[in-house]
A protein has these predicted regions:
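Surface-exposed molecular-recognition determinants
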Residues: 2-163
């Protein structure tokens, strides 16, 4: 097992609209305990879309209703703070992103227990987004867990409801 440093396992550079992006799969290296994933300047096709995330098993996203998550969202809107818990979902979700000029989302995730067949896989996230031309800025911190065992996870898929 490697220790003490970050090792790049996979990278995807997207330059035009795609339905989803998957990291891992055949590029997955199962010799690590923790994986860091970052995405930068992500923009949906349709305005005001939440980023969705699923763990993959055998390169295929797990679409079962076994995703639980909780976030604290901080926005520059009047609401200010928002708690966002959900259970028995078919994906993890992040904050909404805009698609106008200058709008984008960024995040850093840490993935844990991905290679275990007996423990739940889970993640933590730090996310930020400039969401609309009214200058709404959102930040998010939280995490989630896939409450099913039996299969090792080998990656993560990102998508938007609109593609």
């Amino acid at each position: 097992m490697a220790t003490g440093s970050l090792i790049k396992i996979d990278e995807e550079i997207v330059t035009s609209a795609v339905a989803s992006v998957t990291l891992g799969g055949t590029d997955w290296d199962s010799s690590y305990d923790v994986y860091m994933v970052q995405y930068l300047n992500v923009v949906p096709v349709t305005d005001n879309q939440e980023v969705r995330m699923r763990f993959t098993e055998g390169g295929t996203p797990n679409t079962t209703a076994n995703y639980d998550y909780a976030y604290k969202i901080i926005e520059t809107l009047a609401a200010g703070f928002e708690d966002f818990p959900a259970t028995n979902q078919t994906y993890f979700r992040g904050v909404r992103y805009g698609n106008n000029t200058g709008e984008a989302g960024n995040a850093t995730l840490y993935l844990f227990n991905m290679n275990s067949t007996t423990e739940y896989a889970f993640y933590t996230i730090e996310e930020n987004a400039y969401i609309n031309d009214a200058a709404t800025i959102a930040g998010c911190t939280g995490g989630g867990v896939l409450t099913v065992t039996g299969t090792a996870r080998d990656g993560i898929e990102f998508s938007f409801p609109s593609g």
